[in-house]
Amino acid sequence: MELDTLDVALLRLLTEHPRIGVLELSRLAGVARATVTARMERLRASGVVTGYGPQVDLAAAGYPVQAFVTLEIAQGRLDEVTEHLAALPGVLEAYATTGPGDVLCRVAARSNDDLQQILLELDRFAGIRRSTSVVVLSTVVAHRTLPRLTHGPQRGAHHAPSYRDPA
């Protein structure tokens, strides 16, 4: 789906004010409530907006140790490795990649000892041939999407004549 300027404006407002209601969102965006409702439904239906939930600080929740783990997978075993990774609570996310490894995982642990147990559990799985890990010291750029959306190609909004562009 190609996003237009109104879509991006709504996503920016939702990111800046995650608990905002539709009425306030429409006021800040300068469009009718029905327009906001329709746009939000379209963004959800197309998979652009995948959910609304809290952003959890893992360190504050008791998981201050994070690492990125690169896995080399045995030929033809990606599906079963994927199932194994999904079953491990310490694995936050995993991506199939190019390069020297096949899968890149982000894991969270309570301590270095806990991290070591997670790594041992990964290495014990038959479909994983080798793993290498790097421990996160600090986050220098947190997960974000708005810079990509606001600096990417966008077309003008298709909107009702009452819409006033804030520019």
Predicted regions and their residues:
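A compositional/biophysical signature of low hydrophobicity enriched in polar/charged and small residues
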Residues: M1-A167
